[in-house]
Amino acid sequence: MQYAPALEHLVGNTPLIKLQNASEETGCTILGKAEFRNPGQSVKDRAALFIIKDAIAKGMLRPGGVIVEGTAGNTGIGLAVVGASMGFKTVIVIPDTQSQEKKDALRLLGAQLVEVPAVPYKNPNNYVRYSGRLAAEIAKTSPNGAIWANQFLSLIHISEPTRHES
């Protein structure tokens, strides 16, 4: 029986699928990457894993530490899935306009949700900006570290090793 030693080992290495109609219409082989095969069913699982691994490598996060992110999308799910499997707590700051299904899914994955009013980014209480301040506050008292994942500005997203992972 084959098995993965841990959930994070299932992130990436997703298969390629030949897109038959597109291939026939173009005369080229067109392939799609099956990112839905990641544990959180999204390409954002990759970003989550690399952000977390980067924080661990830099000594900013140890098991039991806290990952904070402001997100209305799949990054929160990726951070919750991968973070929980690696022994981290996840706090997601989310606009109160998001669907109940998304909120329920995040909670089922173990994330703590902080719901804030949906306001423009220029407002200091925008969910992304709020999450940065919250991460800084949590970091002051978390003995195992706390990070702001900061998906929108994280340089780990554009580093050479990340871009070429399969």
PLM feature spans:
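Phosphate-handling active-site elements
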Residues: 56-65, 87-94
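Fold-independent oxyanion-binding glycine-rich loops
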Residues: 13-14, 33-35, 71, 96, ...
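Positively charged, low-complexity intrinsically disordered leader regions
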Residues: 1-63
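Active-site-proximal loop->helix
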Residues: 75-136
